[in-house]
């Protein structure tokens, strides 16, 4: 029987429920338990696929093609699981399912209400996502007290009652601020947050108290007294300089022991040697490189969360400290490429819309002409093709039909037909809805032997995740390859170009897929490791010249 750990948050948002949940799951996995994680989002959008990155941050794409919350990226990086559409659902999805059932007549003419129909659908979705796990950690998005979260909180309250204390446990993450002017830690916000939670019928079993320093014993006792939580279950969740230290910290606070004792589970001791190795590799690098990330969402780096982490993972696996310099592609359009001069490598990530595209193309040109290692992902591959078409193949005005529908040379165009994971034909047009209509999820790509991509992966076939509507236009295949563009990866049926390279360049690669979604701190990713090794070689070459 699956046991459940429900994680809620209080006082303020962005306290790190996702990382806390993933870290606890990592410890439980290290104790030999089969775990899974779910994220419940209170917003009415069906999924975050059409939400602005400035509002929501990154959209994480799962293997089965779901567009989900970025916390699922944390789950996959901390725990050796592949999440899917059952691991993340929203208020919009829940209401959509209930309304669909009502239209079918499933409720036999009854009045459809939040309780029991919405809460029952939430409980059904939680149980479906948790199926087969020893322990399911269920994170409730938002903050206790938000009106949007109430149906979710009511649903997990009911589950706690239905399953009993030995099968369900509640963890509440809260803020314990330090007031510098008074020189004191304040526990009142935590007390009020727990009071709010208890007012809707949930008594937390464990408190994770987010603070910039460990809780003094006096404050711990005070919190325990006023929240009705046993003192040893009031855990200090201190700020750390490296999120991959958090499993080690929470284990040192005996969080996993408290959880397993309350759930009546016997498990072997945790083997956290992998996490110790990760932390050690980050703290003692052999070299340092600077990678310029040229994008349009650089004011909110959470927009590139998986990409940031993938570069860190590559640093772990190559003994390199990777410093990311975020560069606004719009500024490159007006200020020129001077800001690129002292970089060891350039990366152009994915994105949508015309804003900043010419700046990205300028960054590609600089990398190509100056022999700087370049990695282009999704749109980053497309702008590499556009730049090559314009300045090497001589196709003046070459562009993507996403930005210039009437371009004389549409080297990038809308995909109108492709095969999905099950081999079914998917068709789209320019008039299709924006939500959920892209080429999404894991797709098999065949690599050409003797190419850089094949060298990095060491395999003829790979599976990577996609999220795009536009693709390389095969009508320009002969022209561009004749000019020197290398096509090193194609879709399984050979119809779509997935990877491009330049043969007379130290390291230049563009991929239509998103390799960052499958990178983890313990395993890394071959493409990013190859990119960072190339950045190190570039750094050493630059240092030699300056000496």
From Swiss-Prot:
Residue positions binding L-glutamine: 351, 379-382, 402, 469
Keyword Metal-binding: yes
GO molecular function: ATP binding; CTP synthase activity; glutaminase activity; identical protein binding; metal ion binding
Pathway note: Pyrimidine metabolism; CTP biosynthesis via de novo pathway; CTP from UDP: step 2/2
EC top class, as a word: ligase
Residues given in the record as UTP binding sites: 13, 186-191, 222
Region (Amidoligase domain): 1-265
Gene Ontology annotations of biological process type: 'de novo' CTP biosynthetic process; pyrimidine nucleobase biosynthetic process
Domain (Glutamine amidotransferase type-1): residue spans on this chain: 290-541
Entry keyword ATP-binding: yes
Activity control note: Allosterically activated by GTP, when glutamine is the substrate; GTP has no effect on the reaction when ammonia is the substrate. The allosteric effector GTP functions by stabilizing the protein conformation that binds the tetrahedral intermediate(s) formed during glutamine hydrolysis. Inhibited by the product CTP, via allosteric rather than competitive inhibition.
Recorded GO CC terms: cytosol
Chain ranges passing through the membrane: none
Binding-site list for Mg(2+): 71, 139
SUPFAM superfamilies listed in its UniProt record: Class I glutamine amidotransferase-like (SSF52317), P-loop containing nucleoside triphosphate hydrolases (SSF52540)
InterPro entries named in the record: Class_I_gatase-like (IPR029062), CTP_synthase (IPR004468), CTP_synthase_N (IPR017456), GATASE (IPR017926), GATase1_CTP_Synthase (IPR033828), P-loop_NTPase (IPR027417)
Enzymatic reactions: UTP + L-glutamine + ATP + H2O = CTP + L-glutamate + ADP + phosphate + 2 H(+); L-glutamine + H2O = L-glutamate + NH4(+); UTP + NH4(+) + ATP = CTP + ADP + phosphate + 2 H(+)
Matching HAMAP family: PyrG
Family the UniProt entry places it in: Belongs to the CTP synthase family.
Protein name per Swiss-Prot or TrEMBL: CTP synthase
